[in-house]
Amino acid sequence: MTIFARDLIYRIETKVLLPLFLVHLLPYVTCQQESESVDRNRKTNFPTETVIAIIVLAIFISLSMVACFLHKTFYRAEVEAASQEVFHSRARRGLEKELVESFPIFLYSEVKGLKIGKGGVECAICLSEFVDKETLRWMPPCSHTFHANCIDVWLSSQSTCPACRANLSLKPGESYPYPITDLETGNEQRDEHSLLQLGTNLDRFTLQLPEEMQRQLVSLNLIRTSNMTLPRAMSSRQGYRSGFSHGRQTLRRAISMSLSFSLQAASVRSTVGRDDLVLETSQAKDKDLCEQSFQHLMPEKV
């Protein structure tokens, strides 16, 4: 619409008004005729031609001013519209799908027994408490956990954590925003987005797990994503199932190892306690026997 209006005004000025203006100026540049009759006719026609020329000039100037005003107005409106579109497009931009899928995913029942703190943990997006059979996605940079479906929709248009507004996007040169642990070698690479220390920031949106379990979740997620990108000789569905089942088995092994370690520690503590109790009892008995023997050795009072 703006381009059409500018073109129309330009055509009117160049093809209609400008020729009329030049035509009315022609009598003033012609040579003067020597006959008196022609001079009298020019004197009688001078006022009319002058008025017409002034009117045409005024119309030309007015249209030029209107064209300049419309050009500035429409140009400013176009610039503002373009800036608003860029702003909204940046605001709607979320995280890449590959980055979202790199965040660990698991069932709540698999880690429920190992979480730190009392009380339930709930999703900050739908405000529903987690149940055993629900699939969760864990944000390693801030340890906040959400339903996988809820956080996937959120991160499609946002790049921050819904609970703490931490920036989850990658910086240039980074591959993952959290530590990567190799299951075979046990090597760990830490960057500035390190995991939160245990016992800190315990709230209803934070799923705090032991540090070893955190590393296991990250590593198992890497195995699952690598198995999902197998060659096309295998179907994508089979690759996903094999990767997910393998990750589940390894996660169960890690949980069982953690539980067995806890049970062993508890049994050791109980054994040590029983040994201390037996030792104290035997020492008390020995002390009583010594006192009795000492009393027997003492001479009787006369």
Swiss-Prot record:
EC numbers: 2.3.2.27
PROSITE patterns tied to this protein: ZF_RING_2 (PS50089)
PTM annotation (Phosphoserine): residues: S226
Cellular location(s): Membrane
Cellular component GO terms held in the UniProt record: membrane
Family annotation (CDD domains): RING-H2_EL5-like
UniProt enzyme class: transferase
Domain notes: The RING-type zinc finger domain mediates binding to an E2 ubiquitin-conjugating enzyme.
Protein family per UniProt: Belongs to the RING-type zinc finger family. ATL subfamily.
Protein name per UniProt: Putative RING-H2 finger protein ATL35
Classification of source organism: Eukaryota, Viridiplantae, Streptophyta, Embryophyta, Tracheophyta
